[in-house]
Design a protein with these regions (language model features):
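Class I SAM-dependent methyltransferase SAM/SAH-binding core
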Residues: 46-103
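A short acidic, Gly/Pro-enriched loop at the edge of an enzyme's catalytic core
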Residues: 105-115
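A short SAM/SAH-binding and catalytic strip from SAM-dependent methyltransferases
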Residues: 114-127
Length: 219
């Protein structure tokens, strides 16, 4: 069972900057996402679950053009504060919003070039993942892209063992793993709504990450 929104907020308020310690398994997947998301020509990025702003900083430093804007949201006030400190030098190009916990993207219909979410959907219930995908489809431009990274099922002997152990901990006490569990992102994207342009799994130190880039199917 997924954590309540209040439990998630309390956990990540306490966790704070320690979230950056997960870079040892996250960075390779984030780099792969960046390499395939064609970010150099976009003008607007929305990140659902910005955390400490670590990935946003990477995008603003190395991937986005100097005219591109970034908007990020997070449920945790501590994470928003850390992201504000980290991204302050980018001035008006950056907007950070503390989420109420509702699955909502603060953007007009068909106004965003890229919707990004990394290591967040594995925290949500299946219902909330579907709601997020619906919101992402609403705000993306017709040629926009949904860019995702998540914990996923292991593909090697070691990562399969890690998956089993992680799921056991999640069932026993979700708070021990921050409310996150391995999920299959591809199973949550309705084929009538999304066309997957890129799909890859990377394993680092026994932890498997799924990378997906999808485009909205024209209606």
């Amino acid at each position: 069972m997924s954590l309540s929104r209040n439990d998630v907020q309390r956990f990540y308020d306490r966790f704070g900057s320690k979230q950056d310690s997960q870079a040892f398994y996250e960075d390779a997947a984030l780099a792969d996402l960046t390499a395939h998301a064609h970010l150099d020509t976009v003008q607007s990025v929305f990140e659902f679950g910005c955390g400490t702003g670590r990935y946003a900083q990477q995008l603003l430093q190395r991937a986005l053009s100097a005219s591109a804007t970034y908007t990020g949201c997070d449920l945790s006030s501590v994470m928003i504060s850390l992201a504000e400190q980290r991204l302050r030098s980018y001035g008006e190009r950056v907007k950070l919003v503390q989420s109420s916990g509702e699955i909502h993207i603060e953007a007009a219909d068909h106004s965003v070039d890229r919707v990004v979410s990394t290591y967040v959907l594995d925290l949500l219930s299946d219902v909330d993942i579907k709601a997020f995908a619906t919101e992402a489809r609403r705000v993306l431009k017709p040629e926009g892209k949904l860019c995702l990274v998540s914990l996923t099922q292991g593909t090697t002997s070691a990562s399969k063992l890690v998956t089993v152990l992680w799921k056991v901990l999640y069932r026993l006490r979700p708070m021990l793993v921050g409310g996150c569990r391995p999920v299959l992102l591809s199973a949550h994207l309705d084929k009538s709504d999304w066309s997957v342009a890129y799909h890859h799994t990377i394993v680092r130190y026994g932890v498997a990450s799924e990378i997906i880039i999808a485009v909205p199917v024209a209606t």
